[in-house]
């Protein structure tokens, strides 16, 4: 069995200043050549990818397989029961759009679960490298202090904190970053001792699009439109997807919602190009807010003139309230024993903010007074925002700020979630020509296909508690499965 701690220590031992400078120079060249930037910020700012052992990856896959039936059951129940659906706090226009049959069964053919995963065991490192410049870095934590902490009794900890069921970004970024890392001098040295396998994602996206299209009734070869505003910082990823789709023989354009018309039963880009398959990256809420419910794309999808992935019905589970629905004791009767065990194991205690009584730590309590009194134990999240917008970390807010945020949440739907451990690992970067290693917090975000299984993983690093590249700062790194060579 491969020991992750040993592998990372060995990688860092290979990364002297000379190899670090050479690797960083090559990475900088590749990031610019392939336009791997989020707006004007490079996607990756460190010199090591994320490593997982096969056992750790299988643990993630098993957990996703265990929890997804509960999400699926919640979605099916919500579609058929308006009273139950009210728990998701959909707006009036969302209630209208989820009535549109997308033409295929999965509400989210492409999705991502955002999690915090602290694998175990990680044995203490017996090796120090005092001669390395990294050890001299001001503010660097001592080796070992930032390693993922095990849970009670030494088990791994894995908590699902958000389900991105609408527009899961970065599969193409991940693929290209994997290629970039494979060619670095440091990886050439590391691969002599470890097998390193990537987790590609673009082909899964293409499969999901085509499966949905054929289910929808498409017979001709589709023309794909990647749909989002032209000014978004993720535009460079759309270019990567366009290049990939075209390499597989599919005509593809990148189109701004403002460029569409719906005329004579056809969805037209630039007024002339018929589109029958939409890879939707624009947020439905932004599309409706900026363009209205009579927008060409909304009309075309509603009238079965175009297939769209993900469909309007993805909004039900994309709401952060979906985790509250799973976690709430009032809904426990819906789930099988296996589903309930998965919820208890992986979903942190989560509730929609309201004046109510509920169960917490085995007792019935008044929700709002508890949240006010124990702010350091909770995080407050708007039900339908992205990029870290509106999130309030109770342990970083003063009492006045926290109580004001709670009051505001009574009017604008929000969830409160019990604080989870934030794992960290040491990652090297080049600072003023020398390799320096700092502990960085990280999340682990499995890609989920058809609401069923996991393949691929997004890893984000940060020195702040809010791990989100959109929120500013941070770094994306590709994730590899590693095994020590015999």
Predicted features along the sequence, with ranges:
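Preference for protein termini
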Residues: 1-486
């Amino acid at each position: 069995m491969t020991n992750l701690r040993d592998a990372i220590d060995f990688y860092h031992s290979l990364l002297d200043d000379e190899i670090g400078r050479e690797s960083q120079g090559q990475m900088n060249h590749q990031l610019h050549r392939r336009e791997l930037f989020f707006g004007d910020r490079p996607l990756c700012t460190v010199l090591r990818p994320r490593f997982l052992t096969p056992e750790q990856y299988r643990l993630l896959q098993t957990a996703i397989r265990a929890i997804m039936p509960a999400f699926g059951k919640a979605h099916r129940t919500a579609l058929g029961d308006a009273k139950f659906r009210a728990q998701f706090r959909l707006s009036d226009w969302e209630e209208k759009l989820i009535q549109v049959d997308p033409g295929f069964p999965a509400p989210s053919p492409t999705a991502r679960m955002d999690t915090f995963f602290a694998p175990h065991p990680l044995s203490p490192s017996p090796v120090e490298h005092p001669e390395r410049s990294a050890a001299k870095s001001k503010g660097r934590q001592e080796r070992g202090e930032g390693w993922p902490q095990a849970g009670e009794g030494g088990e791994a900890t894995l908590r699902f904190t958000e389900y991105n069921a609408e527009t899961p970004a970065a599969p193409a970024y991940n693929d290209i970053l994997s290629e970039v890392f494979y060619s670095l001098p440091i990886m050439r040295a590391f691969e002599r001792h470890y097998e390193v396998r990537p987790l590609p994602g673009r082909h899964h996206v293409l499969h999901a699009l085509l499966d949905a299209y054929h289910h929808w009734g498409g017979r001709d070869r589709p023309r794909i439109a990647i749909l989002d505003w032209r000014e978004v910082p993720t535009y460079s990823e759309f270019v990567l997807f366009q290049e990939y789709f075209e390499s597989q023989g599919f005509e593809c354009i990148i189109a701004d919602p403002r460029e569409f018309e719906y005329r004579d039963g056809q969805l037209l880009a630039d007024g002339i190009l018929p589109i029958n398959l939409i890879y939707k990256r624009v947020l439905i809420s932004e599309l409706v807010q900026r363009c209205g419910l009579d927008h060409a794309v909304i009309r075309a999808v509603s009238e079965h003139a175009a297939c769209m992935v993900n469909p309007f019905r993805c909004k039900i589970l994309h709401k952060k309230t979906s985790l509250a629905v799973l976690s709430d004791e009032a809904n426990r009767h819906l789930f099988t024993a296996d589903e309930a065990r998965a919820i208890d194991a992986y979903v942190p205690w989560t509730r929609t903010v309201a004046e109510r009584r509920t169960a917490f730590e085995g007792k019935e309590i008044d929700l709002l007074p508890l949240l006010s009194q124990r702010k350091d134990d909770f995080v407050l999240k708007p039900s339908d925002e992205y990029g870290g917008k509106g999130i309030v970390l109770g342990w970083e807010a003063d009492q006045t700020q926290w109580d004001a945020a709670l009051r505001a949440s009574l009017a604008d739907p929000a969830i409160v979630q019990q604080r989870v451990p934030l794992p960290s690992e040491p990652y090297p970067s080049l600072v003023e020509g020398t390799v320096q290693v700092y502990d960085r917090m990280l999340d682990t975000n499995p890609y989920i296909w058809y609401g069923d299984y996991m393949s691929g993983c997004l890893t984000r690093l940060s020195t702040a508690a809010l791990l989100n590249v959109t929120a500013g700062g941070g770094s994306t790194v590709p994730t590899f499965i590693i095994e020590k060579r015999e």
